Amino acid sequence: MKQTTMTLAGTALALTLALQAPAFGHGDAAESDDTIQALISQVRRATAAFQDVQVARAAGYEQFLSCVDQPGQGAMGIHYLNGTLVADAVLDPLRPEALMYQPKKNGQLELVGVEYIVFQDAWDALHPQPPVLFGHPSHLVRSPNRYGVPAFYELHLWVWEHNRNGIFNDWNPKVRCP
C-alpha cells in the first residue's frame, strides 16, 4: 500500500511538473533533463500498447489523416486521433490526443510518436496562456490550415522514433511517407 501511494504521488508530481515546468528550447537540451526524461518514460509506458494499431482503434483512436510530410524537413506519419480527447480541452501527458504511425513497406504501421492537441478557442476560454507540456510551449496552428480544422495548439513528442531535430520538433527526417 505504501509503495502504491508513493508511486501515485510521484506520478502526480511528475505530471504537475510536466504541465507547469518552464519552457525549454528544441533539441537535445530538453532531452537531457532528468525530469523530462522520466516523464517521457511514463508516456512510453502509457502508449506502449498502441504499438498495435488495433489496440489504438479499440481505445477510440481513428485515422484522421493520410501520411503527412513536409519536403526537405521530414514527416509526421499517419495520425490516429481520439475525438473524445481532442474535444475535452484537457491536455494529459499520459493520454495523448493523437498517435503517429509510420507506414512500413509491408503495409504495417509503426508507432513513432504522439501529439497533444487542443483547440485554441476551448483552451483560451479556460486559460490565460497557451499550453506548456514537458516544459515546452505548444505551437499554434492557425486556421485556415492544411488539415481543414479550427485553430489549435499542438505539441509533438517523438517517444518511439528518435528525431535528430529534437524530441518536440514537428517534423522527423527519419519518418517517411510512401
Please name every model-derived segment:
Residues 1-9:
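Bacterial N-terminal signal peptides that target proteins for export
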Residues 9-20:
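Bacterial N-terminal signal peptides
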